[in-house]
Amino acid sequence: MFQAILAIIPILWLILSLAVFRMRGDLACFIGLIITLLTSIIGFHFSIKDGLTAGLEGAMMGFWPIIYIIVAAVFTYNLTTASGGMTVIKRLLMTITEDKRILVLILAWGFGGFLEAIAGFGTAVAIPASILVALGMKPLRAALICLIANTTPTAFGAIGLPVTTLAQVTGLEVKQLSVIVSLQLFILIVAIPFVLVSLTGEGKRPIKGVFGITLASGLAFALPQILVSNYVGAELPSIIGSLFCILVTILFVNLRERGKNASPVGGDVAFKEGIIRCLPFILVFFFIMLTSSLFPAINQLLAKVSTTVSIYTGEHAKPYTIKWLTSPGTMIILATFIAGLIQGMSFKEIGSILAKVLNKLTKTMVTVASIVALSKVMSYSGMINTIAVSLVAVTGGFYPFIAPVIGTLGTFITGSDTSANVLFGELQVKAANNLNMNPYWMAAQYDRGNCRKNDFASKHCSCSGTYWFRRSRR
């Protein structure tokens, strides 16, 4: 019991520092790493050398692939914004229908899901909310709707980063884990559009007249996500699901409003201009798909370009492999550079945008590297196993009901589905093994809890709250 108390000290520190003391994320996580190292050495007889190399391996994993993908995703979004692409996308979406319930399905649910899938970091809340406010919706309601919409898409956000990270820290096969996560999210994905429409509509029957479109919007997101998870992996489910959702919803709108004097989809945006401005996202989609396991010949050829290093010096050490060309980060950056050049931007302009992204995400890099290093030290020293055994002993067969709550807590503390998966992901597999349960279902159940709480994660609340405050002051 004493060791279990020692093992949760780093987690208690993160809860207190981030949720109570409101300390900066990078500082809190770095101090948490120091506390974890000291606890592992003093309380778990972990050698200094093993502790430092475990932390170094974790930091390396934090930078590659996690931080690398984050930088790449934000780079794509910022370049698209700088080139005027986001303005064109807004114009395309704003000319479809005047029914705010349907606009919420397209903007908050479909377009927001796409932004979460391609970039994350609050863009999926801030941008759709700003468009909804521009269309006449009250800022607080727009923020609330976009926060709720941005729950289930986070599981495969930032090119599938949360699920791929969860698979990496737990040792589970990523494609199988992706499928189970998609299956567990199915009911929520179908249900959330109805919640959004209910919050948007006026009167006692807000669903009246849009039930079919709302159901189609949910199914169009959920079904492709399951299929893509099964055949491709974790990188594209939310991207393809959100695109299908937008297309199907627009198709239903066109069928519904046929014969009415409705504005044509796209308004005054020429087809060629729309393609050019959306090119970064289009190329990212095709590059990731072509280099995925869906095309094994290309995937296996590129996977040969790799570097293997031995970092951790203790028991059960495994070499760490960096696959340079099959990483989504590499494909995203390459696609974005090519798209920028086609759009007429110079290498200097594109490089400047990337440099600004790197500068802006410095604190995020420290946060992610520290929390992954902390997780690795806890794992290798036996702290995670001690917590798992203690939790199973206390909760017994009820632990599967506790797993989503832990996911909820992890996302609320760290503000990130990915960071929560790093922090508590291995704990779920250890607990599942102790209970003789399927570790894939337990890990997916935990990740579902992450999604539920993601709408109240610090970065999303601050993003939407800041926008609402600025609008209310005008």
From Swiss-Prot:
Subcellular location: Cell membrane
Keyword Transmembrane helix in record: yes
Domain of life: Bacteria
Single GO MF descriptor: solute:proton symporter activity
Disulphide bonds in the chain: none
UniProt keyword annotations, A-Z: Cell membrane, Membrane, Transmembrane, Transmembrane helix, Transport
Topological category with respect to the lipid bilayer: Multi-pass membrane protein
Transmembrane spans: 4-21, 28-48, 63-85, 105-127, 142-164, 177-199, 209-231, 238-255, 281-303, 324-346, 387-409
Pfam families: Lactate_perm
InterPro entries associated with the record: Lactate_perm
GO cellular component, one term: plasma membrane
Record family assignment: Belongs to the lactate permease family.
Biological role stated in the UniProt entry: Plays a role in L-lactate utilization.
Stated name of the protein: L-lactate permease
Native source species: Streptococcus iniae
